Protein backbone atom coordinates (compact mmCIF):
# COMPACT_ATOMS: atom_id res chain seq x y z
CA UNK A 1 0.00 0.00 0.00
CA UNK A 2 1.17 3.53 -0.79
CA UNK A 3 1.56 6.33 1.71
CA UNK A 4 -1.04 9.12 1.73
CA UNK A 5 0.41 12.40 0.49
CA UNK A 6 -2.22 14.39 2.40
CA UNK A 7 -4.14 13.40 5.51
CA UNK A 8 -7.04 15.18 7.14
CA UNK A 9 -6.53 18.51 5.40
CA UNK A 10 -9.34 21.02 4.99
CA UNK A 11 -9.59 24.58 3.74
CA UNK A 12 -12.15 26.90 2.18
CA UNK A 13 -11.59 28.92 -0.97
CA UNK A 14 -13.35 32.28 -1.03
CA UNK A 15 -13.88 34.79 -3.82
CA UNK A 16 -11.00 37.24 -3.79
CA UNK A 17 -8.57 34.80 -2.16
CA UNK A 18 -5.16 34.78 -3.84
CA UNK A 19 -3.42 31.83 -2.26
CA UNK A 20 0.25 30.94 -2.53
CA UNK A 21 0.89 27.22 -2.00
CA UNK A 22 4.33 26.71 -0.53
CA UNK A 23 6.35 23.77 0.75
CA UNK A 24 9.51 21.80 0.12
CA UNK A 25 10.03 20.03 -3.21
CA UNK A 26 7.91 16.89 -3.19
CA UNK A 27 5.54 18.22 -0.52
CA UNK A 28 2.62 17.95 -2.93
CA UNK A 29 2.00 21.50 -4.13
CA UNK A 30 1.42 20.62 -7.79
CA UNK A 31 -0.46 17.48 -6.74
CA UNK A 32 -2.87 19.55 -4.67
CA UNK A 33 -3.56 21.74 -7.71
CA UNK A 34 -4.33 18.59 -9.71
CA UNK A 35 -6.66 17.40 -6.96
CA UNK A 36 -8.50 20.73 -6.95
CA UNK A 37 -8.79 20.64 -10.75
CA UNK A 38 -9.98 17.01 -10.57
CA UNK A 39 -7.13 15.95 -12.85
CA UNK A 40 -6.41 13.22 -10.31
CA UNK A 41 -8.79 11.43 -7.96
CA UNK A 42 -8.28 11.22 -4.22
CA UNK A 43 -8.48 8.02 -2.20
CA UNK A 44 -10.77 9.71 0.28
CA UNK A 45 -12.29 12.99 1.39
CA UNK A 46 -14.65 15.32 -0.42
CA UNK A 47 -14.53 18.57 -2.37
CA UNK A 48 -17.57 20.80 -2.68
CA UNK A 49 -17.91 23.45 -5.38
CA UNK A 50 -20.86 25.55 -6.46
CA UNK A 51 -22.61 23.81 -9.34
CA UNK A 52 -21.76 26.41 -11.97
CA UNK A 53 -18.23 27.21 -10.80
CA UNK A 54 -15.74 27.64 -13.67
CA UNK A 55 -12.17 26.59 -13.08
CA UNK A 56 -9.03 27.11 -15.16
CA UNK A 57 -5.75 25.25 -14.60
CA UNK A 58 -2.36 26.24 -16.03
CA UNK A 59 -0.64 22.88 -16.38
CA UNK A 60 3.02 22.28 -17.09
CA UNK A 61 2.21 20.01 -20.06
CA UNK A 62 0.57 21.90 -22.94
CA UNK A 63 -0.75 20.30 -26.11
CA UNK A 64 -1.99 22.53 -28.95
CA UNK A 65 -3.77 21.56 -32.15
CA UNK A 66 -1.32 22.06 -35.01
CA UNK A 67 -2.05 24.61 -37.72
CA UNK A 68 -3.58 27.38 -35.59
CA UNK A 69 -2.21 30.89 -35.38
CA UNK A 70 -1.61 32.53 -32.02
CA UNK A 71 -4.86 34.50 -32.32
CA UNK A 72 -6.84 31.41 -33.36
CA UNK A 73 -5.47 29.48 -30.39
CA UNK A 74 -6.20 32.33 -27.99
CA UNK A 75 -9.77 32.54 -29.32
CA UNK A 76 -10.30 28.96 -28.07
CA UNK A 77 -11.03 30.69 -24.76
CA UNK A 78 -14.33 31.87 -26.26
CA UNK A 79 -16.03 28.67 -27.39
CA UNK A 80 -19.60 29.87 -26.82
CA UNK A 81 -18.94 33.29 -28.36
CA UNK A 82 -17.51 31.69 -31.51
CA UNK A 83 -20.50 29.32 -31.72
CA UNK A 84 -22.95 32.23 -31.47
CA UNK A 85 -21.03 34.12 -34.16
CA UNK A 86 -21.64 31.23 -36.56
CA UNK A 87 -25.31 31.05 -35.55
CA UNK A 88 -25.77 34.81 -36.07
CA UNK A 89 -24.13 34.57 -39.47
CA UNK A 90 -26.48 31.73 -40.43
CA UNK A 91 -29.59 33.62 -39.25
CA UNK A 92 -28.56 36.79 -41.10
CA UNK A 93 -27.99 34.74 -44.26
CA UNK A 94 -31.50 33.31 -43.92
CA UNK A 95 -32.99 36.76 -43.40
CA UNK A 96 -31.52 38.07 -46.66
CA UNK A 97 -33.50 35.46 -48.60
CA UNK A 98 -36.80 35.80 -46.73
CA UNK A 99 -39.73 37.90 -47.90
CA UNK A 100 -42.47 36.43 -45.65
CA UNK A 101 -42.18 39.26 -43.16
CA UNK A 102 -45.62 38.66 -41.62
CA UNK A 103 -45.23 34.91 -41.07
CA UNK A 104 -44.81 33.26 -37.66
CA UNK A 105 -41.56 31.59 -38.73
CA UNK A 106 -40.06 34.96 -39.71
CA UNK A 107 -41.09 36.43 -36.34
CA UNK A 108 -39.51 33.45 -34.57
CA UNK A 109 -36.32 33.93 -36.56
CA UNK A 110 -36.14 37.61 -35.56
CA UNK A 111 -36.71 36.65 -31.92
CA UNK A 112 -33.97 34.02 -32.15
CA UNK A 113 -31.64 36.66 -33.60
CA UNK A 114 -32.45 39.08 -30.76
CA UNK A 115 -31.90 36.40 -28.09
CA UNK A 116 -28.55 35.39 -29.55
CA UNK A 117 -27.40 39.01 -29.89
CA UNK A 118 -28.24 39.63 -26.23
CA UNK A 119 -26.36 36.49 -25.17
CA UNK A 120 -23.43 37.48 -27.38
CA UNK A 121 -23.23 40.90 -25.74
CA UNK A 122 -23.56 39.39 -22.24
CA UNK A 123 -20.59 37.10 -22.93
CA UNK A 124 -18.46 40.03 -24.09
CA UNK A 125 -18.70 39.23 -27.78
CA UNK A 126 -18.12 42.82 -28.83
CA UNK A 127 -14.97 43.13 -26.72
CA UNK A 128 -13.20 39.77 -26.84
CA UNK A 129 -10.94 40.53 -29.80
CA UNK A 130 -9.55 43.67 -28.16
CA UNK A 131 -9.21 41.89 -24.81
CA UNK A 132 -7.31 39.06 -26.50
CA UNK A 133 -4.83 41.39 -28.17
CA UNK A 134 -4.30 43.33 -24.93
CA UNK A 135 -3.54 40.20 -22.89
CA UNK A 136 -1.28 38.67 -25.54
CA UNK A 137 0.71 41.91 -25.67
CA UNK A 138 0.84 42.03 -21.88
CA UNK A 139 2.44 38.59 -21.94
CA UNK A 140 5.10 39.71 -24.39
CA UNK A 141 3.73 39.05 -27.89
CA UNK A 142 3.98 41.65 -30.65
CA UNK A 143 1.13 42.36 -33.06
CA UNK A 144 3.16 40.87 -35.91
CA UNK A 145 3.22 37.56 -33.98
CA UNK A 146 -0.57 37.17 -33.93
CA UNK A 147 -0.87 35.52 -37.34
CA UNK A 148 2.10 33.20 -36.88
CA UNK A 149 1.50 29.50 -36.24
CA UNK A 150 1.84 28.31 -32.65
CA UNK A 151 3.99 25.42 -33.96
CA UNK A 152 6.81 27.90 -34.66
CA UNK A 153 7.10 29.00 -31.01
CA UNK A 154 9.07 27.39 -28.19
CA UNK A 155 7.47 25.68 -25.21
CA UNK A 156 7.91 28.78 -23.08
CA UNK A 157 6.06 31.00 -25.54
CA UNK A 158 3.34 28.36 -25.98
CA UNK A 159 2.88 28.43 -22.22
CA UNK A 160 2.24 32.18 -22.52
CA UNK A 161 -0.51 31.47 -25.07
CA UNK A 162 -2.10 28.95 -22.71
CA UNK A 163 -1.89 31.44 -19.85
CA UNK A 164 -3.53 34.10 -22.04
CA UNK A 165 -6.44 31.72 -22.74
CA UNK A 166 -6.98 31.11 -19.04
CA UNK A 167 -6.93 34.82 -18.22
CA UNK A 168 -9.42 35.51 -21.01
CA UNK A 169 -11.88 32.88 -19.76
CA UNK A 170 -12.57 34.86 -16.57
CA UNK A 171 -12.88 31.68 -14.49
CA UNK A 172 -14.20 31.70 -10.94
CA UNK A 173 -11.11 29.80 -9.78
CA UNK A 174 -7.67 30.06 -11.37
CA UNK A 175 -5.06 27.38 -10.61
CA UNK A 176 -1.54 28.36 -11.68
CA UNK A 177 1.46 26.03 -11.54
CA UNK A 178 4.67 28.09 -11.85
CA UNK A 179 3.13 30.79 -14.10
CA UNK A 180 6.30 32.93 -14.19
CA UNK A 181 8.65 30.12 -15.28
CA UNK A 182 9.01 31.39 -18.85
CA UNK A 183 8.16 35.07 -18.41
CA UNK A 184 10.49 38.05 -18.64
CA UNK A 185 10.43 40.83 -16.02
CA UNK A 186 8.02 43.07 -17.97
CA UNK A 187 5.54 40.22 -18.45
CA UNK A 188 5.80 39.22 -14.78
CA UNK A 189 5.00 42.78 -13.68
CA UNK A 190 2.05 42.89 -16.09
CA UNK A 191 0.78 39.53 -14.76
CA UNK A 192 1.11 40.69 -11.15
CA UNK A 193 -1.07 43.72 -11.88
CA UNK A 194 -3.62 41.60 -13.74
CA UNK A 195 -3.91 39.00 -10.97
CA UNK A 196 -4.16 41.59 -8.18
CA UNK A 197 -7.36 42.89 -9.77
CA UNK A 198 -8.72 39.42 -10.67
CA UNK A 199 -12.31 39.05 -9.46
CA UNK A 200 -12.20 35.30 -8.81
CA UNK A 201 -10.09 33.12 -6.51
CA UNK A 202 -6.50 32.18 -7.33
CA UNK A 203 -4.37 29.30 -6.08
CA UNK A 204 -0.80 29.36 -7.33
CA UNK A 205 2.52 27.58 -6.94
CA UNK A 206 5.64 29.64 -7.56
CA UNK A 207 9.28 29.69 -6.53
CA UNK A 208 9.33 33.43 -7.24
CA UNK A 209 9.05 34.89 -3.74
CA UNK A 210 8.62 38.46 -4.97
CA UNK A 211 5.77 37.34 -7.24
CA UNK A 212 4.09 35.61 -4.27
CA UNK A 213 4.47 38.78 -2.19
CA UNK A 214 3.08 41.02 -4.92
CA UNK A 215 0.09 38.83 -5.81
CA UNK A 216 -1.08 36.72 -2.86
CA UNK A 217 -3.07 37.69 0.22
CA UNK A 218 -3.04 34.23 1.81
CA UNK A 219 -0.39 31.51 2.21
CA UNK A 220 -0.95 27.77 2.65
CA UNK A 221 2.11 25.79 3.66
CA UNK A 222 2.16 22.06 2.94
CA UNK A 223 4.35 20.08 5.32
CA UNK A 224 4.36 16.34 6.09
CA UNK A 225 0.87 15.82 4.67
CA UNK A 226 -0.67 18.68 6.64
CA UNK A 227 -1.51 22.25 5.65
CA UNK A 228 -0.99 25.43 7.64
CA UNK A 229 -3.19 28.32 6.58
CA UNK A 230 -2.12 31.94 7.09
CA UNK A 231 -4.13 34.98 5.99
CA UNK A 232 -0.92 36.71 4.96
CA UNK A 233 1.22 37.07 1.82
CA UNK A 234 4.53 35.21 1.71
CA UNK A 235 6.95 37.54 3.58
CA UNK A 236 4.42 38.30 6.31
CA UNK A 237 3.75 34.57 6.60
CA UNK A 238 7.47 33.94 7.19
CA UNK A 239 7.54 36.50 10.00
CA UNK A 240 4.37 35.12 11.58
CA UNK A 241 5.57 31.52 11.34
CA UNK A 242 8.86 32.53 12.96
CA UNK A 243 7.02 34.20 15.84
CA UNK A 244 4.84 31.12 16.33
CA UNK A 245 7.87 28.81 16.42
CA UNK A 246 9.63 31.08 18.92
CA UNK A 247 6.62 30.95 21.25
CA UNK A 248 6.47 27.16 20.94
CA UNK A 249 10.11 26.94 22.07
CA UNK A 250 9.54 29.12 25.12
Describe each PLM feature range.
Residues 1-249:
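ABC ATP-binding cassette signature C-motif
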Amino acid sequence: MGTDLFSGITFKLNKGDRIGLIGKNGAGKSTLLKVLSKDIETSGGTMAFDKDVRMGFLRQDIDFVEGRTILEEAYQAFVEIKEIELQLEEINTQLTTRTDYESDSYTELIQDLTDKQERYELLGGYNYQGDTEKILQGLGFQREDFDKLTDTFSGGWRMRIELAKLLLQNNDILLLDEPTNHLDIESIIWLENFLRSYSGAIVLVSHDKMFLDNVTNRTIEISLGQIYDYKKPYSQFLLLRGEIKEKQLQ
